[in-house]
Curated annotation (Swiss-Prot):
Main localization of the protein described in the UniProt heading: cytoplasm
The protein's name in its UniProt record: Peptide chain release factor 2
Modification type N5-methylglutamine: residues: Q253
Described function: Peptide chain release factor 2 directs the termination of translation in response to the peptide chain termination codons UGA and UAA.
InterPro entries: PCRF, Pep_chain_release_fac_I, Pep_chain_release_fac_I_sf, PrfB
One annotated Gene Ontology cellular component of this protein: cytoplasm
UniProt record, GO biological process: viral translational frameshifting
Protein family according to the UniProt entry: Belongs to the prokaryotic/mitochondrial release factor family.
Keywords for this protein: Cytoplasm, Methylation, Protein biosynthesis
PANTHER family: CLASS I PEPTIDE CHAIN RELEASE FACTOR, PEPTIDE CHAIN RELEASE FACTOR 2
One example GO MF annotation: translation release factor activity, codon specific
Length: 366
């Protein structure tokens, strides 16, 4: 005889979670109605007279279909599984019972994915993003730590199928990096990485210390979305200081021959962007301006939320963020200080295995 009560309880649990998503989390009825409207618009013969609008509608349809179709599949699947369980019990058929369990696993996975995607509800969560890394005080040790973080995030992005483009790298005095900016390209890049803003603390026996002593160093990460060119961010040219300089770091044999690198400082906020990945000063300036626009947008969003944030948690350091994760390599322990998630597989994390930390922070609503 089968243990059917645990299976019935699981079916009920999945049904309840699906109902929650269908209701206030996803607003299924409104999205289904909107999907029908979008489909009708896309079927109009003159829709491609406005290519940008047509593309926006296509993207909206894809998002709506993901939600509506998945919920339809979940509801139908749970109905089918309930019927399958009844058949298994009536026929005392172990094979059918096992098939029921397998189908539940598939449905649970689909539901989990949709629940997780619902955490990406921010205005720019679907956008590409920029990641700025800055070595803290500590000289060569901190600069080496910044380069380790860059490698870690590049590996993570590659593992998730994101494309990356290094916008700027400033070499350290002896080793590592003083700073770096990387663009991460792909759907939900910002949604995935937005909780990584903050200070990362490294504790290890320094390879740069002849005495092999333990050192603590810090590097900061700042993640901000790529914003549309038409977003309403006013930049007064009089507020800008634009410097050109010779590029450093990787870039080919011609990289240091001309002053093609560009640094832009927004004087009222002291926000700085820089780009050196192209040999054209003009292209580097355009890219740096695009980053400045994105940073100013993020700055304005943080200002709007600052009062609320202070009321909710006076301990949080708005802007670059407070310390978020500790990497103690001698003790083989990496711990997220916000969620409590930790692992002893330090090398895997430094090789880009960040999902457990990122998912926990997103689920915690950080």
């Amino acid at each position: 005889m089968f243990e059917i009560n645990p299976v019935k309880n699981r079916i009920q649990d999945l049904s309840d979670r699906t109902a929650v998503l269908r209701g206030y989390l996803c607003d299924y009825d409104a999205k289904k109605e909107r999907l029908e409207e979008v489909n009708a618009e896309l079927e109009q013969p003159d829709v491609w007279n406005e290519p940008e609008r047509a593309q926006a509608l296509g993207k909206e349809r894809s998002t709506l279909e993901e939600i509506v179709t998945t919920i339809d599949q979940l509801e139908q699947g749970l109905e089918d599984v309930s019927g399958l369980l009844e058949l298994a019990v009536e026929a005392d058929d172990e094979e059918t019972f096992n098939e029921t369990i397998a189908e539940l696993e598939v449905l649970d996975g689909k539901l989990g994915q949709l629940e997780f995607r619902r955490m990406f509800s921010g205005e720019y969560d679907r956008a590409n993003c920029y990641l700025d890394l800055q070595a803290g005080s500590g000289g060569t040790e901190a600069q080496d730590w910044a380069s380790m973080l860059l490698r870690m995030y590049l590996r993570w992005a590659e593992s998730r199928g994101f494309k990356t483009e290094i916008i700027e790298e400033s070499d350290g005095d002896v080793a590592g990096l003083k700073s770096a900016t990387v663009k991460i390209i792909g759907e939900y890049a910002f949604g995935w990485l937005r909780t990584e803003t903050g200070v990362h603390r490294l504790v290890r026996k320094s390879p740069f210390d002849s005495g092999g002593r333990r050192h603590t160093s810090f590097s900061s990460a700042f993640v901000y979305p790529e914003v549309d060119d038409d977003i309403d961010i006013e930049i007064n040219p009089a507020d800008l200081r634009i410097d050109v300089y010779r590029a450093s770091g990787a870039g080919g044999q011609h990289v240091n021959k001309t002053e093609s690198a560009v640094r832009i400082t927004h004087i009222p906020t002291n926000i700085v962007t820089q780009c050196q990945n192209d040999r054209s000063q003009h292209k580097n300036k355009d890219q740096a301006m695009k980053q400045l626009k994105a940073k100013l947008y993020e700055f304005e969003m943080q200002k709007k939320n600052a009062d609320k944030q202070v009321l909710e948690d006076n301990k949080s350091d708005i802007g670059w963020g407070s310390q978020i994760r500790s990497y103690v390599l001698d003790d083989s322990r990496i711990k997220d200080l916000r969620t409590g998630v930790e692992t002893r597989n330090t090398q895997a994390v430094l090789d880009g295995d960040l999902d457990k930390f990122i998912e926990a922070s997103l689920k915690a609503g950080l």
